[in-house]
């Protein structure tokens, strides 16, 4: 089995996310899954860019899919925003032929075409659906039963359900099942499925700060040892925002 990897913009470039790429590569290698990075990968033009120029944003995402199509592989990504973009472009191009034609015209200008044959998968969904929690447990090497975590799915991997075709999006459990196979206690607590406010960062920082404060308080009150994020943007929001929030609210988050 061989997959084309689309890492996105955040994972390879932000210091606090270096572990995402390293861990993903190690896990896939351990599972004997070959990967090949998409050459000269570009930004996937996530959904907020689509409000500025829909056709161009779709063409940007389709470019990476066209590269994967040339490689003859389906695509994996650890980034929820990228996953959302690739699922959306596949849906739009298959549903609206006129939009497919416009996107193809842009791709032709850089010597590419996209026939819509590439399936885009989020790495967590791939591990759960194609590999399976039981198989991962067999390959585990450490006992993590002493750890309690708060799992954050984020918004962009799950919604809208009709487009992304992931488990029922309001109360998902698939990632919980994965980590619980290693003995980890995934604590079910109020607020763990709510937005972290990451998309508001840089636009309305005060609102993003307030929402993050609420999510950190939720996790603190649940008594978890740490937070595990499915979404790289959620990771940045939680990780980089903690020190600032400790100063603003005069509170130490565990």
Language-model-detected regions and their locations in the chain:
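Iron-sulfur cluster-binding electron-transfer modules in prokaryotic oxidoreductases
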Residues: 1-254
């Amino acid at each position: 089995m061989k997959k084309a990897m689309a890492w996105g913009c955040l994972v390879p470039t932000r210091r606090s996310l270096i572990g995402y790429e390293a861990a993903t590569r190690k896990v896939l290698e351990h599972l004997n899954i070959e990967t090949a990075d998409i050459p000269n990968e570009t930004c996937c033009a996530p959904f907020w860019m689509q409000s500025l120029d829909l056709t161009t944003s779709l063409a940007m995402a389709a470019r990476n899919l066209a590269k994967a199509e040339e490689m003859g592989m389906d695509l994996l990504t650890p980034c929820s925003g990228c996953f959302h973009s690739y699922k959306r472009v596949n849906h739009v191009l298959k549903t609206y032929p006129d939009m497919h034609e416009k996107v193809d015209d842009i791709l032709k200008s850089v010597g590419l075409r996209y026939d819509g044959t590439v399936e885009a998968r989020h790495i967590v969904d791939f591990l759960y659906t194609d590999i399976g929690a039981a198989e991962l447990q067999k390959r585990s090497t450490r006992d993590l039963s002493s750890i309690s975590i708060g799992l954050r799915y984020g918004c962009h991997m799950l919604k809208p359900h009709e487009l992304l075709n992931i488990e029922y999006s309001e109360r998902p459990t698939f990632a919980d099942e994965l980590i619980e196979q290693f003995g980890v206690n995934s604590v079910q607590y109020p607020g763990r499925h709510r937005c972290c406010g990451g998309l508001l960062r840089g636009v309305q920082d005060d609102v993003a700060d307030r929402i993050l404060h609420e999510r950190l308080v939720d996790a603190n009150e649940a008594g978890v040892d740490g937070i595990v994020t499915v979404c790289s943007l959620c990771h940045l929001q939680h990780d980089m925002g903690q020190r600032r929030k400790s100063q603003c609210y005069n509170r130490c988050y565990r």
